[in-house]
Design a protein with these regions (language model features):
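Short beta-strand/loop motif that positions the catalytic acidic residue
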Residues: 136-137, 143-145
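Short beta-strand immediately N-terminal to the catalytic nucleophile in serine-hydrolase-like folds
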Residues: 55-57, 82
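Conserved alpha/beta-hydrolase "acid-adjacent" motif
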Residues: 150-155
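Conserved alpha/beta-hydrolase "nucleophile elbow" surrounding the catalytic nucleophile
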Residues: 1, 57-62
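Hydrophobic, aromatic-rich cap/lid helix
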Residues: 106-130, 148
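Flexible "cap/lid" loop of the alpha/beta hydrolase fold
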Residues: 63-66, 70-71, 78-105
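Active-site loop/oxyanion-hole signature of alpha/beta-hydrolase fold enzymes
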Residues: 2, 9-13, 19-54
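Catalytic histidine-centered segment of alpha/beta-hydrolase-like enzymes
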Residues: 174-184
Length: 192
């Protein structure tokens, strides 16, 4: 959340392929935004793609990648999930929304969403739980998590256990935004 395609520039520049798409998940022109609307926009965006996708997602992007792979198994060649949750911790969302309510409206401008839209969007994810559907993901999966990303480390380890085909990489001295802390690591994994 709060990232743009520009935040992935350092990773993308190191990739051995040129056909890379970093979709913007939020649009300031949309009045109402929800998790399902973002997922629907991605499904529409990739509906005509013939070749299976190699999807890399961080945080919300990882959650969307998991959901997309469950819903469109035939369209996904592999997943790289960074700082991933597969079951949204409702207490964390509630705490996050409490913090959001205390923040000034100006703090949300860089995301392209208003404060109220951000709170509604976060609330729309409150009940997401893909635990029972993870066995539908059959493609290779790489799970990455920064050692300092304490909010997602446990879930990343559990995800590795729930997906037998998954490999787990804990990146030392890195926090949540691995595209900023360890772009070389992500690029190396995506290039293999």
């Amino acid at each position: 959340m709060g990232q743009t395609a520009q935040d992935w520039k350092e990773v993308v520049q190191q990739l051995s392929i040129s056909d890379v798409d970093c979709p913007e998940l939020f649009s300031s022109t949309e009045d109402e935004i929800s998790y399902l609307k973002i997922l629907g926009n991605l499904e529409q965006r990739y509906s005509e793609v013939k070749e299976p996708l190699r999807i890399c997602g961080l945080s919300l992007g990882a959650l969307l990648a998991i959901n997309f792979a469950i819903r469109h198994e035939e369209k996904v060649a592999s997943l790289v999930l960074i700082g991933a949750q597969y079951k949204v911790p409702s207490l964390l969302i509630d705490f996050q929304n409490f913090i959001f309510r205390c923040m000034p409206n100006k703090a949300f401008e860089s995301m392209g969403l208003s404060k109220s839209s951000t709170i509604k969007w976060a609330h729309s994810m409150r009940s997401l739980d893909f635990t029972s559907q993870l066995n539908n993901i059959r493609c290779p999966v790489t799970v990455l998590c920064g050692k300092k990303d304490t909010a997602n480390l446990k879930a990343s380890k559990q995800l590795k256990e729930l997906l037998p085909q998954a490999t787990l990489h804990i990146v030392p001295n890195a926090g949540h935004e691995l595209n900023k802390y360890a772009p070389n690591t992500i690029a190396e994994i995506l290039n293999n």
